[in-house]
From Swiss-Prot:
Binds 1 divalent metal cation. Belongs to the pirin family. Putative quercetin 2,3-dioxygenase. It comes from the Bacteria. Pathway: Flavonoid metabolism; quercetin degradation. Its cofactor is a divalent metal cation. It is an enzyme of class 1 (oxidoreductase). Gene3D superfamilies: Jelly Rolls (2.60.120.10). It comes from Zymomonas mobilis subsp. mobilis (strain ATCC 31821 / ZM4 / CP4). It catalyses: quercetin + O2 = 2-(3,4-dihydroxybenzoyloxy)-4,6-dihydroxybenzoate + CO. This is Putative quercetin 2,3-dioxygenase ZMO1337.
Amino acid sequence: MIVKRPYKNLGFADHGWLQARHHFSFARYFDPDRINWGAVRVWNDDRIAPDTGFGMHPHKDMEIVTYIREGALTHEDSLGNKGRIEAGDVQVMSAGTGIVHSEYNREASDTRLFQIWIMPNQSGHKPSWGSRSFPKKDHAGRFVVLASGYPEDKEALPIHADAAVLGATLNKGDVINYPLEEQRYGYLVVSKGIIAIENCTLQEGDAAGLAEVETISIEAKEDSEIVMVVTGAKI
């Protein structure tokens, strides 16, 4: 099963400094049919204006993965962590028993990012934060695991979830196959370009919910960049 979610149909919020598209119910956007996909609870497509951002605010019991598409983001939290991540970088914040943090675009141009919230495998984990650079040349033509709750993914940022976050950059004409397995769920979003999954064409910003399929075949119709979360049984 492939469920297409066009960019134009996503939830939308205009805060002036923040333009946000919501793949799932979030804040004032609510759709009873769009609560989660597997363990994916939130997927926000954000554009943050220069010298603006999110002030200190709390989170609890959620694995929050930030994928920078353009620009950069500066993070600070109640654990004493400070960091700046830019395009090609990934940040993971495990909220666990509770964390307070801020995120600002301190740059001269817009920052574009995906922020993905994944439900943890249990509540009460110790909060933590980490980031890592994943040069796009390292995942050209193939999926690279960016964050994962599985011990075999030793190069990925760790999360406390039955899930993995994958990224790939594709040249026009590239085809990659991924063994999803029927009992697992996938949620894929196009960060750049145009791709086809079987007979489903996705453009920049579009998404596909994947379920009950053994293997997915992805073809790049032009140079493309994609992000996918694979999770266990639907929660």
